[in-house]
Structures are given as C-alpha cells and as structure tokens.
C-alpha cells in the first residue's frame, strides 16, 4: 500500500498539524507500506500566466514558467494516482487554506487525469477507491463553523478528484485551550480503526 503524506504548514518546526500528521502516519502504516512525502513549502509553484486553455497548453507553446509548472503538476498527479491513502495536514490560516495547499489543488486538478467532464457537462472524479485523512488545526477557528473555509473546501476538492472516503482529525481553537485540543486530536487518532 502507498501512503501519500502532504504537509502544508509554513512552520517547519513546532507545527502542530505536522506533528499530528506524523502521529497519524505512525498509527496507520504497516512495515511494508511505501510512503510518498510532499512538503508543499519546498517547491510549490503557483498557477500563473495561463490563457483560457487553463492547464491544457501544448508542449510546443509552453514557456519556461509553464514547463516548470507542468513538471510539478505531472508529479503531483502521479503521486495522487499512485497512492491508496492520503494524509493532508493543514492549519487554518485567516479562515482558509494555506496558499501552498490551494496551489497544490490548482496543479493537481487536471482534466483527464484527476477528473473529467461527462457528456451531460457534470464532473466526475477519476481517483476512486482511495481514503483521505485531513489533519486540521486552528488557533481560534472552530472546525466546521461558518468561519472555517478550509475543511469544507478541502473535502470538496478531494470529492471533485473522486476521493469520497474522508476522515478529519482536528485540533481546533488551540489558542483557547491548547492542552484540550491536542488531547482530543490524539484521542481521534487513537480511535482510528484500520
């Protein structure tokens, strides 16, 4: 089995979302599992300079920026396709996702690769039979409240890609009671049944 772990916190050291994702990975992985790791703060590029064709630019028409963007996009799509389980850790920044996580979703959303359009115009996700775990942290935002624009968006994106089995581990409102939030998150991880 392949487990794809994606960390998006801008903090390398002292990140609660990264630490919880690591604990989750230790809980679910088996010795024979292959781990694919991606730190979105290491080489993420942002979608820019595209025309109305979106992510469908012929290779001969790509400039250097496009080539770098498509190279990373192809790698991200490959990582998603190859994985059986996906762990995404993300803090809520200003009520939404980290910019690098949004960039990841933009680069991973590829027609014919992660989704397609049906004849009736509706979308269909192509990444079936996968499970995702979201590890969401926040300072003051209550998870799934009307101020949380990360969790529902990320669930929607994964569903858009065809990933319908999504479980959330949360350590929210840490600024109000850090110890309680961490204890609850650890309990959520401990309850996971494989």
Which role fits each region the language model picked out?
Residues 2, 34, 130-132, 164-165:
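Residues at the starts of beta-strands that form the adenosine-phosphate
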Residues 10-12, 139-142, 173-176:
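Short histidine/acidic/glycine/proline-rich micro-motifs that form metal-
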Residues 29-31, 127-130, 161:
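A short, structured loop/turn motif at beta-sheet edges
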Residues 144-194:
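Glycine-rich phosphate/pyrophosphate-binding loop and the adjoining helix
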Residues 46, 122-123, 165:
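Glycine-rich, flexible loop/turn motifs
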